Amino acid sequence: MSQFNPMGGQSTTIQSSLVPIVVEQTARGERSYDIYSRLLKERVIFLVGQVEDHMANLVVAQLLFLEAENPDKDIHLYINSPGGSVTAGMSIYDTMQFIKPDVSTMCIGQACSMGSFLLSAGATGKRFCLPNARTMIHQPSGGAQGQASDIHIHAQEILKIRARLNEIMAKHTGKSVEEVARDTERDNFMSAEESKAYGLVDDVLYQRVPEESK
C-alpha cells in the first residue's frame, strides 16, 4: 500500500509517538503500520479536527486511492470535526459524489458546521451517528476589510455560498430550502436522535450490528 500519512487531519498537538503501531505477520515477514494506515487498508478514513486545505487534500487523496483499489466496495468516513473552511469542505464533498464507491459516513464526537454538511452527504441509508455524538448546522461566516466596494463583493459571495449550501443540505436531508435557511440562521445544535429526525443521518448506532454468518 502506498505510504502516506492519513493522520493529516489530526490536531497538530497530537504527537506521532502517541499513535499506536500495528505489527502484522506476512509471508515476507513482519510489517508494521501506524493504526490509521492499517485502518485505511480496511477502507476506513478519519476526518478529524478543523476542515482545512491540507486535511482536505489528504482525505481526497485517500478517497481516490480507495476507489482505484476497488471501485465497487464501500468507503467508511468517520467524522469528528468542529467544521472549518467551506472551500476545503466542498473539495471533499465533490469527491465523495464523484467517485464510484458509496461513502458511508459516521459521526463520532461531533460533526459541526462543514462537518455536519459532510456527514449528511454520505450515501443514502449509510449515514450514521453514535448515540452521544452531537451535530450543529449554521450559515457560513466570513469577514472582509478594505474598500467598501470590495466588502460588498465579499458579502455577495458569502450569500451565494450560503444559498448553494442550503440547496445541497436540502437535497440530502429531504427538507425544503426554506426550512434549511431558517434552521441555519443561527447555530443549531442537535443530539444524535435529533440529527436522525432532521435527516442528517439515517440511523443512530448503539452497538455494532453483527455480520451475518456466511
From Swiss-Prot:
An MF annotation (GO) of this entry: ATP-dependent peptidase activity
Enzyme Commission number, as recorded: 3.4.21.92
InterPro entries with a match to the protein in the record: ClpP, ClpP/crotonase-like_dom_sf, ClpP/TepA, ClpP_His_AS, ClpP_Ser_AS
Enzyme type, top EC level: hydrolase
Gene3D superfamilies: 2-enoyl-CoA Hydratase, Chain A, domain 1
Entries under CDD domains matching the protein: S14_ClpP_2
Keyword Protease: yes
SUPFAM superfamilies, alphabetized: ClpP/crotonase (SSF52096)
Pfam family, one: CLP_protease
GO biological process entries: protein quality control for misfolded or incompletely synthesized proteins
Catalysis: reaction(s): Hydrolysis of proteins to small peptides in the presence of ATP and magnesium. alpha-casein is the usual test substrate. In the absence of ATP, only oligopeptides shorter than five residues are hydrolyzed (such as succinyl-Leu-Tyr-|-NHMec, and Leu-Tyr-Leu-|-Tyr-Trp, in which cleavage of the -Tyr-|-Leu- and -Tyr-|-Trp bonds also occurs)
Compartments, record wording: Cytoplasm
GO cellular component: cytoplasm; endopeptidase Clp complex
Annotated catalytic residues: 113, 138
Keyword terms of this UniProt record: Cytoplasm, Hydrolase, Protease, Serine protease
Function recorded in the entry: Cleaves peptides in various proteins in a process that requires ATP hydrolysis. Has a chymotrypsin-like activity. Plays a major role in the degradation of misfolded proteins.
Self-association and partners: Fourteen ClpP subunits assemble into 2 heptameric rings which stack back to back to give a disk-like structure with a central cavity, resembling the structure of eukaryotic proteasomes.
Family: Belongs to the peptidase S14 family.
This protein's name: ATP-dependent Clp protease proteolytic subunit
